[in-house]
Amino acid sequence: IELNAARFLTLDAAVKMDTVGNKIAASEIAQIKVYAPNVALKIIDRAIQIHGGEGVSQYTPLASMYAHMRTLRLADGPDEVHRRAVARYELGKYMS
């Protein structure tokens, strides 16, 4: 469910970027930057849990995937920056 939600949020933002431009789609882009990496981390974490101790060993790529995805959450700014941007975009719609 969460994976499909991330996929559809991404597709919605892509359509908006193509039709009205990146500036107007900025809120959707910021939402993706928060939501998609968090969903990926949850999925990887579940896979690690299913594999037990082997999930964090060198015998599976899961520990490395988790580390890479966790780093990605910081690459374009921490989640808090993007959450603040979403709040500003959304509140800006009602402030005149």
Write out the residue ranges for each language-model feature.
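Alpha-helical interface subdomain recognition
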Residues: 1-96
